[in-house]
């Protein structure tokens, strides 16, 4: 454990236990709700206006804005080399510490993503903006924006909106705005959809 660099104007609503290793960063002006039992390992970068339910673990992850992370989610879990003599990396690598993480390929959770309870996202995977991942899914491959994916391994079952609407949502960039501006942009998008 170590210090978590947070800007002076950052606001985190914390549960009883939040463990952060050094190298965990939050954006300036951050406002997140982080429930108890959450552990963030370095390096992690967290956007604004996210909700982390209890007992979330994140390793080497980049998380966008306005995400809802369900209870018991595991982000950025590493693989063990099952073809090596030992499954323990420190034995195979001759290192004193476990070297399982691919720091050059973080796990990326876009903005406005909803991860249901107990979702596992493997290291190096990208989940696109607006995607929804069903409870207990194991995400082993990239998931496109606004997709709905479920299962083990997670597979895209449908999309939240039609292709044209997804394009408009992504272009609007509403999830990069503060809440009041984001709400206004979303209202405008709703009005445009009703006209069609």
Summary of predicted features, one role per range:
Residues 1-40:
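Extended, small-residue-rich solenoid/repeat segments and analogous flexible loops
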Residues 14-17, 23, 88-121, 153-196:
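C-terminal segments of enzyme domains that contribute to small-molecule binding surfaces
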Residues 15, 33-36, 40-47, 51-123, ...:
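Flexible, glycine/small-residue-enriched loop-and-beta-strand segment within the central core
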Residues 79-81, 143, 159-161:
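Conserved catalytic-core motifs of eukaryotic protein kinase domains, centered on the activation segment
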Residues 83, 141, 145-147, 155:
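Glycine-centered loop/turn positions within well-structured domains
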Residues 112, 130, 147:
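Catalytic-loop signature of eukaryotic-like protein kinases
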Residues 118-131, 137-141:
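Beta-rich strand-turn-strand
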Residues 133, 151:
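Conserved G/P- and acidic residue-centered "switch" motifs that form tight phosphate/ATP-binding loops
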């Amino acid at each position: 454990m170590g210090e978590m660099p947070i800007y002076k104007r950052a606001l985190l609503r914390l549960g009883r236990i939040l463990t952060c290793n050094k190298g965990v960063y939050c954006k300036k002006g951050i406002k997140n709700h982080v429930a108890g039992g959450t552990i963030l390992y370095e390096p992690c970068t967290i956007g604004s206006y996210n909700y982390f339910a209890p007992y979330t673990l994140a390793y080497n992850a980049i998380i966008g804005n306005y995400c809802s992370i369900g209870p018991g989610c595991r982000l950025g879990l590493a693989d063990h080399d099952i073809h090596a003599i030992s499954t323990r990396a420190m034995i195979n690598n001759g290192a004193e510490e476990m070297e399982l993480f691919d720091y050059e390929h973080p796990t990326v959770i876009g903005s406005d993503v909803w991860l249901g309870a107990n979702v596992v996202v493997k290291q190096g995977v990208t989940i696109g903006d607006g995607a929804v991942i069903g409870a207990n899914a194991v995400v082993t491959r990239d998931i496109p924006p606004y997709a709905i994916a479920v299962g083990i391994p997670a597979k895209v079952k449908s999309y939240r909106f039609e292709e044209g609407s997804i394009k408009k949502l992504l272009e609007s960039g509403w999830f990069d705005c503060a809440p009041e501006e984001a709400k206004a942009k979303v209202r405008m998008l709703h009005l445009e959809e009703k006209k069609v």
